[in-house]
Regions:
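Bacterial N-terminal signal peptides that target proteins for export
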Residues: 1-8
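Bacterial lipoprotein signal-peptidase II cleavage site
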Residues: 5, 20-30
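C-terminal motif of bacterial Sec signal peptides marking the signal peptidase cleavage site
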Residues: 15-19
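Extracellular/periplasmic metallocenter environments
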Residues: 22, 89-124
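N-terminal edge beta-strand
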Residues: 29-55
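A mature extracytoplasmic/lumenal domain signature
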Residues: 41, 62-65, 73-77, 100-102, ...
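Beta-strand cores of secreted/periplasmic/IMS beta-sandwich domains, seen most often
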Residues: 47-67, 94-109
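Histidine- and aromatic-enriched segments that form or immediately flank copper-ligand environments
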Residues: 66-89
Length: 124
């Protein structure tokens, strides 16, 4: 019975360590990003972000909610053409590397919460 008890204890401890150490995204410094979007109370604080055309760019998502969020970029609000979909982050910050886009106006949202929306303006 002792080996079984030790095995169960080891499994339980491993589960606790995994649960405590798990994150849905990298905790990073958003200061170096080209644009920053903060999610608070199920809304994006920056409803419009602007970047330069023809250059790859970075967007930091600072998630201050306890729910997972991400940023997905679409050609327009119909969401028929997805240009980028970032991984989810819960209660932390993640910086997305996004390929260059042509000058224009694009739509972004959180994939899980479509009411969280914004406009990406690419100038050039």
């Amino acid at each position: 019975m002792k080996p079984l008890r030790l095995s169960l204890l080891a499994v339980a401890m491993a589960a606790v360590l995994v649960a405590c150490g798990s994150t849905s995204g990298s905790t990073v410094d958003s200061a170096d990003a080209d644009a920053t979007v903060t999610s608070v109370d199920m809304a994006f604080e920056a409803e419009t972000i602007t970047v330069a055309a023809g250059e790859a760019f970075t967007v930091a998502l600072v998630n201050q909610d306890s729910m997972p969020h991400n940023i997905a970029i679409y050609a327009d609000s119909s969401k028929s053409e997805t240009l980028f979909e970032g991984e989810m982050v819960t209660d932390g910050t993640i910086v997305y590397d996004i390929e260059a886009l042509d000058a224009g106006e694009y739509f972004f949202d959180c994939s899980l919460h479509p009411e969280m929306t914004g406009t990406l303006i690419v100038e050039g």
